[in-house]
Amino acid sequence: MRLTARFLALFLGVLALLSAAHAEQAADQKLLETYKAGLTLGPEETLIDPKYPIPDYVLWLLDTARGEIGYVEERSGVTKYGTWAGYPAAEWCAEFQCWCVSRVDKQYGTKLLTRVYPNYSGTNVGRDWFIGQGRYISRTGTLPGYGSQWWKDGMTPVAANSYIPQPGDWVFLTDNASGDTSHVAMVEYCAYDANGNIRLHVIEGNNVTKPAPQGVERNDYAIDYWRILGYGTVYDLADMALKFGHSGPKVVALQEELVQAGLLEARYTTGKFGAITQECIKTVQRQAGIQETGIANLETRQALRQMIENKQP
């Protein structure tokens, strides 16, 4: 009798989990259908379905941005986006996107600005914010100041032009050889063109790469366009090499793995890559027979994961 009751409780628990998973899958499918209904593709385009579920806030953000298409700055260069940000006549591509996020927060009660998306003006600030959050993918697969990137799922290197951006991702572009950001745009969708090439379609404001940037408009770019530096992403999809002086969520994740491997005390999970973390990384490298650089690159992270697996009973 007691066994039957336990079996019934277990069965009901599994049923509840399956029901919740089905409901989540149905909700994701509904959001995808809503997203597709809002798109207007060219006659020879084939939509590339997003690889990951689309959060509801991305639909709200895209709707807000679409509602601004056609807005043109005043003759003096003043815009409502710059005015909102406190810089009325400034270059305003970033201010436009941040303004859209703020409108979503106000209308839907979300708290996206400074949590999911940055609130910024100025060169490199937005890109560096995403890097600090651990949600940035370099178009080339190599991140300046960090080195190579690799996919969290599978731990394989990020190849150049391999990431197809998600709706709601932010695209950072440059117009100079230094690689500093000079423009940002919001991904609406990605599609194959008539020749089978991938193009990303964006909504953007004040595109300084054009002769006379003035308004909010749609635009599209080849996925291998040299001006694209990378993407601030909705999801945390890629890792990167970490070294002394780095900080943020990625360092926390690394330190947590070092704790799991028995190499670091939990009290040193600070999010700052200092001397103690560096020595732990050298220990991993020494035990794995790889060069002791103190840099947590892909090879080192793979060795660390193997150490953790070896500790499992």
Describe the role of every protein-language-model region:
Residues 66-74, 98-106, 173-176, 256-263, ...:
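Sec-exported extracytoplasmic/periplasmic mature domains
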Residues 2-22:
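Sec-dependent N-terminal signal peptides of Gram-positive bacterial secreted proteins and lipoproteins
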Residues 107-209:
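...with weaker cross-activation on analogous glycine-rich loops/strands in unrelated enzymes
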Residues 24-111:
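N-terminal capping segments
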Residues 25-48, 157-160, 174-239:
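Aromatic- and glycine-rich peptidoglycan recognition patches
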Residues 52, 232-271, 310-313:
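Acidic, Ser/Thr/Pro/Gly-enriched interdomain connector segments
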Residues 58, 62, 66, 94-101, ...:
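Extracytoplasmic/secreted envelope proteins and their assembly/folding machinery
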